Amino acid sequence: MTLIGKKLKTNNFFKMIKKLIVFNFIIFLISLNAVHSIEPDIFVQSTVNRASNILSKNISKDDKINELKAIAKETVDIRGVGFYSLGPVRKTLDENQKIKYSELFESYFLKSFSSRLAEYTNPEIEVQGKEVLNKNYTIVNSLLIGTTDRPEVKIDWRIYTKNPENPLIRDLIIEGLSLARTQKEEFSSILNSNDGDINILFKTLEEFSNK
């Protein structure tokens, strides 16, 4: 074999090695992403299990509420839910009003959510399936298991998955009724009854949170 032939063979060998290294690196990155991404159904089951553990603890109601608030702040897109609930009025707010609304809505939401959930004792929710709507949203289907005191309830979770490493809850659909949409209708009613005065809504949220 000539010297040129040996060089060509050597160059081809190193090119093949480089391709293999690049290929393996790409596979590694894909695997790494798969490890860190969280499937929406697993995320929901984990969240409800955490909440159930809190509700079954032998602690005061206030302590349960505080722990449930911490879970909600971590797993719910409170800001997204808040501005959805505000409807088209959100486009008319200045930056200071947006900041104030976000703060008031978070306090309102956390109190409303945690106070209602704290009334349950060890609720058992079973995840039954999921439907990927698009890259940003997945619906997770679940069932609140019935007891002698309450019937079973179908609960669908609208999960925001734009960041697969940090899925967030954007809505609960209970027996076909969207809580986010219901909230939006309530806020719209308050605004329509007060000539669209956002300060009246601010006052309503503040009064609820301070009760």
Residue ranges and their predicted role:
Residues 90, 107-108, 146-147, 176-179:
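Solvent-exposed loop/turn segments at secondary-structure junctions
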Residues 39-117:
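Early exported N-terminus immediately downstream of N-terminal targeting peptides
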Residues 34-37:
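Boundary at the C-terminal end of the N-terminal hydrophobic targeting segment
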Residues 152-181:
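Short beta-strand edge/turn micro-motifs at domain boundaries
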Residues 20-31:
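Bacterial N-terminal signal peptides
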Residues 111-153, 204, 208-211:
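Surface-exposed, charged secondary-structure patches
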